[in-house]
Regions:
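Nucleotidyltransferase catalytic core that binds NTPs
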Residues: 1-210
Length: 210
C-alpha cells in the first residue's frame, strides 16, 4: 500500500500572504498533500483583534490555491473555525495547536498508514520551545518530520535552536528537522507588516480575487 506524505501547515492567515503560498507550494514539491489549517487560538491567547473574518480568510486562501499549479495537492481545512459552533469561549481559550494536531492526525493518518509531517516558519520555530506541549508535538510527529522554512530576517540553519524529544526507545535525544527556503521576494513578508501596509496589500489581494 502506498504511504502518502501529508504536511500540515497551521497559520493565523490574517491575512494569508504570497509568502504563505510560497511555503505551501514548496511543501507540495516533496509531499503528496499539504493541508492548510487557518487557526484561531492566537487571538484568544494573545488578546489580538481579528483583521479578517473566518469567511474572508477562507476566501483569500482558496483564491490563492485555485491559482496554484499544485491546487490538486492542497486541502484547506477549516477545522478550527468549525470549533466555534461546538465549544464555549472558555474551551476555545484553552485550545492549542497540540490539540488540533491530534485532531488532524486522527483525520488524515488513516490509522497510521500515512506519514504526517508539519511545516512552520523559522520565526515560529525559534519560539517553538514556548509552545504548549511542544515536546509532545515532536514525539507525536517523530524525528525528522518537522519542516522549517529558513531565510527570513537573516535566519540561517546555524542559528536555529535544537530541541529534545523522546525517541521510540523512550530515550531523550536531539530532534532533527528538515529545512528549506522560499523565493527571496517573500523572505521579509509577514502578515503583521501587511496589516501595517493595508493599501499596498489590498491592490495585490484584488488581483488574486479577480
Amino acid at each position: 500500500m502506498y504511504i502518502k506524505k501529508i504536511c500540515l501547515f497551521g497559520c493565523t492567515a490574517d491575512p494569508f500572504t504570497p509568502a504563505h503560498m510560497a511555503m505551501v507550494e514548496a511543501a507540495c514539491k516533496i509531499h503528496d498533500i499539504v493541508v492548510i489549517i487557518p487557526t484561531i487560538v492566537d487571538y484568544y491567547r494573545a488578546g489580538k483583534t481579528k483583521w479578517l473574518s473566518d469567511d474572508q480568510k477562507l476566501e483569500v486562501i482558496n483564491a490563492f490555491v485555485n491559482k496554484s499549479k499544485f491546487w490538486h495537492k492542497i486541502i484547506v481545512d477549516d477545522h478550527e473555525f468549525q470549533l466555534r459552533t461546538r465549544l464555549s469561549f472558555e474551551q476555545l481559550a484553552n485550545r492549542r495547536f497540540y490539540h488540533t494536531l491530534n485532531d488532524m492526525i486522527s483525520k488524515y493518518s488513516e490509522n497510521g498508514m500515512n506519514e504526517i509531517c508539519m511545516m512552520i516558519g523559522s520565526d515560529s520555530y525559534i519560539n517553538f520551545g514556548t509552545w504548549y506541549a511542544y515536546d509532545k508535538i515532536l514525539n507525536i510527529l517523530g524525528d525528522n518530520r518537522l519542516y522549517v522554512v529558513t531565510g527570513r530576517n537573516g535566519m540561517t540553519n546555524e542559528l536555529l535552536p535544537t530541541y529534545k524529544f523522546l525517541n521510540e526507545n523512550g530515550k531523550l535525544q536531539d530532534y532533527h528537522i528538515n529545512t528549506f527556503k522560499i523565493d527571496d521576494r517573500f523572505k521579509d513578508m509577514s502578515a503583521t507588516k501587511i496589516r501595517a501596509k493595508y493599501s499596498d496589500y489590498k491592490t495585490y489581494l484584488d488581483d488574486v480575487l479577480d
